[in-house]
Structures are given as structure tokens and as C-alpha cells.
Curated annotation (Swiss-Prot):
A lipid is attached at residue 17 (S-diacylglycerol cysteine). This is Membrane-bound lytic murein transglycosylase C. InterPro entries: Lysozyme-like_dom_sf, Murein_transglycosylaseC, Murein_transglycosylaseC_N, Transglyc_AS, Transglycosylase_SLT_dom_1. Its EC number is 4.2.2.n1. It comes from the Bacteria. Belongs to the transglycosylase Slt family. Its main location: membrane. It catalyses: Exolytic cleavage of the (1->4)-beta-glycosidic linkage between N-acetylmuramic acid (MurNAc) and N-acetylglucosamine (GlcNAc) residues in peptidoglycan, from either the reducing or the non-reducing ends of the peptidoglycan chains, with concomitant formation of a 1,6-anhydrobond in the MurNAc residue. One of its GO terms (cellular component) is cell outer membrane. PANTHER family: MEMBRANE-BOUND LYTIC MUREIN TRANSGLYCOSYLASE C (PTHR37423:SF2), SOLUBLE LYTIC MUREIN TRANSGLYCOSYLASE-RELATED (PTHR37423). A lipid is attached at residue 17 (N-palmitoyl cysteine). Residues 1-16 form the signal peptide. The gene is mltC. It comes from Edwardsiella ictaluri (strain 93-146).
Amino acid sequence: MKKVLALALIAPLLISCSGKKPDSNGEEYIKDTNGFDILMGQFAHNIENIWGINEVLIAGPKDYVKYSDRYLTRSHINFETGQITIETIATLNPAETLRQAIVTTLLMGDDPSSIDLYSDANDIKPSREPFLYGQVLDNTGQPIRWSGRANSFADYLLQNKLMKRTSGLHVIYSVTIQLVPNHLDKRAHKYLDMVRRASERYGVDESLILAIMQTESSFNPYAVSRSDALGLMQVMQHTAGKDVFVSKGKWGTPSRSYLFDPEKNIDTGTAYLAILQNTYLGGIQNTTSRRYAVITAYNGGAGSVLRIFSSDKGQAVNIINQMSPGDVYEALTQRHPSAESRRYLYKVNNTQKNYRRIR
């Protein structure tokens, strides 16, 4: 089975923030999306040629994947399972190649806009506090901040944890590092102040923002999707991003570097939640019913939510207002045409309960 994390060369199909449809003025969007599809196709083909058909691995919403060394070496962080895998098919001194990749990964900074995940460029810059600081402990149980400790840990891994396997014509050398058990909480806490500012600015419950961030990206600031949704809240430039810019009186759409900035991404994603909450779905009177609709719309679009109840938007709102929140939830999780959106409401609603105690 192909080891593909985030490759699906299909244009989005629904208006949403993290989902799948061009806006009504979609010519620019389609052109941009087609360009991204071409880039992804070329990149995947390149990886397949180098690593083999069963070893295609590409960055996704919850997976950081960075290639180096002429694409012969890669670092993969699965932010959902909490596992780092660093591997190489280099034939000349693979241990030293792995050591350099281990150190680079452990010390990388937290600026996603500076890293090109679709090249083998050596563009990962260290910082005073690495992004993984506190999420990885070395063999002595200590967090890793500086080069000396990172190199010592790399040497330990190569001496004690080096693995070798064969795939096709390649021998793959690798090491695996486990993140600490509470790695998700540690990443979430990095963004709490940003979430609280956005919550206050737009009147959106911070527990909802956090639940969407966890569901969308597992708090991976490098997150990218097959439809080119970006960052922590998986914002799409030409749909949600454009709506937010219009609401702020700004021209155009947010750039990729803009959306890879964690604070700007959280601000944009939260502003879009506010648009859904107060404008597109603002006529829904019951706050719980409206929250269910907003969550589903963040994934699949407000139009698809309302069409469950009626093809007429005003009539759809009237029907929702005559229903209990439980009946609205049941309709959204059972009758929405997208299985992904049906699951999305279930996931976010359950996850939000875990964050309601955070203040």
C-alpha cells in the first residue's frame, strides 16, 4: 500500500475554511489550485522516483515531512501519534547523514514560513527555544535546547536505536523518537495567549477555537492539506481567507507566509468563525444549534449546512429555529452529504468539552 499522507490531486468542492470549494468568483482560486496540484504532482513523482512507489511521504495537516540531502533523507513528525521518524536511503555514510538530520530536526525553530516542505533546501533555522523543546526528552530525561545535547542524543540514538529495512532496491536506515505523552497539551499551551486574544477580539469561545485547532492540525503550525489549507486552523487563502480580508476592508487574499504565521492564522480562522456565527448563520437563534451549524460549516461550508433543511436559506433558518439542538445535531451528523463533515461535528464537539475548563 502506498505510504501517502497528503496527496490527492483534486480541486476542492465545497465552500469552507478547511474544506473543499472555490468561491463564486472562483477563476483566480481555480488557477491557484491547479498550480498547487501541478506542484504536488511533480513533487510526489520526484519522491516516487527516488524512494520507490511504496515510500511516497508528503506533509499533511498533522504530519511534518521535510526532505534534505538531494531528497535522500527525510524527517517525519506525526503530531497526532507523537512520533518522529528520521530516515535515509543515502549509501555514503548514512549514519552521519542521519545524525545531521536528527540534530536539525531537534533544534528547528517555530517559523513555518521559513521552511519549504516541497524542496530539499537546507532552510531549517535553529532558534533559542526550538519548536520541539519540552516535547522531546533525551536519553537522560532532559529537554533539548542546545546543539551539544542534540548531538549527544543523536549519537545515542545511532548507537542504540538505529534500524535498517529494505524497500524495493533501497536499504533504509532510520531512528524513531517518541514525543512526551502530553505533547499535544504542550503545543496547545504555546498558542493559548493568541487564542485568548482572538476570542476576545471576535467574540468566539476560546474552547471552540482550540477544539478546531486540535481537530484540524493537532497544533502543527507547519500544517498543509491536499487542498492547500494552511497552518494551525487550516485556512484556505481564496475562500475563508478572502472572506476575512473583505470583512476587514482589505484587498486580495492572505499570502501563504501570512497564514503560516501562527498568530495571523489563529486571527484569520477565528475571524472566519465569527463570520459564520454572526453573518452566514446568525439567524439561528439557539446558541447550541448555531454552534453545531458553525462547526459543520467551518469544514463543509454554510451553504451545505442550510441545504440539509431547505434549498431556501431563509426557510432553512426558520426550520432550524423550530428544532431542538439535539435534532439539529442529529440532522447534521446523519444527513450532511459529506461524510467528512458529519464526522467533523462529532470530533470538534467532543474535543471542545475538554477545553471548556481552560480560562
